[in-house]
């Protein structure tokens, strides 16, 4: 029964506006509380921002830095609200996490020119795993607004001088535009892609460079795919549905065009 409810919940969420994922999750878990943990760990939702009380720096919230109702800051490695027995990475993995946060902070400034980014690592039996989060918003709540959320989850398995990486990347995008002439348009969606690759590892620092290259390449591919395929198709659909000119003028032009075709066929 629980598996059927879980599958039904996922199917329902796939059919609803990704912009409202958080509210829809709350509604579903209020009806079936037993699904809360499974849904929170399985469903990607727009990232939320919180400020680290110790360092005064913003960081992003997700299921991977959550322990109960507390969230761990990547800058201080402390939980907010405070949690005495919260799960933190080992000393080695924490050093990698700090280095990755510094590297992706530069990446965020270069590629996003602002926004917020956070990186979280945790230990595995034969390596480690992590998540890279990036968020950029434009005029949230205004007539012209947009939000981009990138969630990159990876596993790194050590194999001597090589490491096997498995990366799952998700982009959640929301664009909204409203004006008096054309009305309102809301475009929301998400995309997920995966890749597995073996790469050379000379030292722990190589892991940060390798993951950075994988994320950079994946984001470039997903941006191009969104722009060329999804945005291009959406533009064609909107162009078919909407016309800047009056409907009467469009109908008159269409009638004239059809009359010319009939004249040529005689």
Swiss-Prot record:
A GO cellular component annotation here is: cellular bud tip
Checking Gene3D superfamilies in the record gives: 1.20.58.570, F-actin capping protein, beta subunit
Q: Does the keyword Endoplasmic reticulum apply?
A: no
Main location (coarse class): cytoplasm
Gene Ontology BP term (one): mating projection actin fusion focus assembly
Query: Which Pfam families is this protein grouped with?
Result: F_actin_cap_B
Subunit arrangement?
Answer: Component of the F-actin capping complex, composed of a heterodimer of an alpha and a beta subunit.
Recorded protein name is F-actin-capping protein subunit beta
What species is given as this protein's source? Emericella nidulans (strain FGSC A4 / ATCC 38163 / CBS 112.46 / NRRL 194 / M139)
């Amino acid at each position: 029964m629980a598996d059927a409810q879980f599958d039904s919940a996922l199917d329902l969420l796939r059919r609803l506006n990704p912009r409202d994922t958080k509210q829809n999750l709350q509604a579903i878990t209020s009806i079936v509380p037993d699904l809360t943990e499974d849904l929170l760990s399985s469903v990607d939702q727009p990232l939320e921002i919180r400020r680290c009380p110790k360092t005064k720096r913003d960081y992003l919230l997700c299921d991977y830095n959550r322990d109960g109702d507390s969230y761990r800051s990547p800058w201080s490695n402390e939980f907010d609200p405070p949690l005495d027995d919260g799960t933190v990475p080992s000393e080695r993995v924490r050093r990698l996490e700090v280095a990755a946060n510094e590297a992706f902070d530069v990446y965020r400034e270069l590629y996003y020119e602002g926004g917020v980014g956070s990186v979280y690592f945790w230990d595995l039996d034969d390596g480690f795993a992590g998540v890279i989060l990036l968020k950029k918003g434009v005029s949230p709540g205004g007539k012209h607004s947009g939000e981009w959320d990138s969630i990159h989850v990876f596993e790194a398995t050590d194999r001597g001088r090589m490491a096997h990486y498995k990366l799952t990347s998700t982009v959640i995008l929301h664009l909204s535009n409203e004006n008096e002439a054309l009305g309102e348009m809301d475009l929301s969606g998400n995309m997920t892609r995966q890749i597995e690759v073996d790469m050379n590892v000379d030292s722990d620092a190589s892991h940060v460079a390798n993951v950075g290259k994988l994320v950079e390449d994946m984001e470039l591919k997903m941006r191009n795919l969104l722009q060329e395929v999804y945005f291009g198709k959406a533009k064609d659909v909107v162009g078919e549905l909407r016309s800047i000119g009056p409907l009467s003028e469009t109908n008159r032009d269409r009638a004239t065009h059809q009359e010319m075709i009939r004249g040529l066929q005689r």
